[in-house]
């Protein structure tokens, strides 16, 4: 009897673990003016595209309140442009990250031809955003306007 209860508890706890851990992702291809960006995005995220004179902005809004921006264009400002980073890394691109006054996480990746950033991310959700940003692949394209 004790063994059945322990096995039942183990099965229930593993089911809860796997239901929380499994998110469905789809491949997104974004066409910026001169760059094609491929990334793996969680399903159920709201997507908004805005074109302006010098570039394009893709905004992804998550249920948890986090926002992911992918943009091209030198004059476009983001809500985190004035934040002071707690750490900066420079490898193939510049990575800056930190925490705002409310304790929410943010990160800004600056590539040569576009920028990617997230903000308003609760610390427990940050791993999901890292997965998206660290999985970005891009290639230059020739786009006629």
Predicted feature residues:
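Positively charged n-region of N-terminal signal peptides that target proteins for export
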Residues: 1-6
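C-terminal motif of bacterial Sec signal peptides marking the signal peptidase cleavage site
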Residues: 18-19
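Secretory pathway targeting signatures of secreted, lumenal, and periplasmic proteins
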Residues: 30-84
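Surface-exposed amphipathic alpha-helical segments
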Residues: 33-39, 43-47, 115-145
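Short, surface-exposed beta-strand/loop micro-motifs that present aromatic residues
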Residues: 58-60, 100-111
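Short, surface-exposed beta-strand/loop "edge" segments at domain boundaries and coil↔beta transitions
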Residues: 64-71, 76-78, 101, 113-131
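Short Gly/Thr-rich strand-loop-strand
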Residues: 80-106
């Amino acid at each position: 009897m004790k063994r059945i209860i322990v096995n039942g508890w183990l099965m229930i706890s593993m089911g809860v673990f796997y239901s929380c851990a499994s998110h469905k992702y789809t491949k997104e291809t974004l066409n910026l003016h001169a760059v094609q960006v491929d990334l793996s995005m969680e399903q159920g995220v709201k997507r908004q595209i805005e074109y302006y004179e010098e570039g394009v902005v893709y905004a992804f809004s998550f249920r948890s309140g986090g926002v992911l921006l992918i943009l091209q264009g030198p004059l476009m400002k983001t809500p985190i442009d004035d934040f002071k980073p707690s750490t900066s890394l420079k490898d193939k691109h510049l990575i800056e990250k930190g925490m705002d006054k409310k304790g929410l996480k943010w990160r800004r990746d600056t590539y040569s031809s576009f920028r990617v950033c997230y903000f308003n991310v609760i610390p427990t959700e940050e791993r999901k955003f890292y997965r998206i940003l660290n999985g970005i692949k891009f290639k230059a394209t020739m786009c006629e306007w």
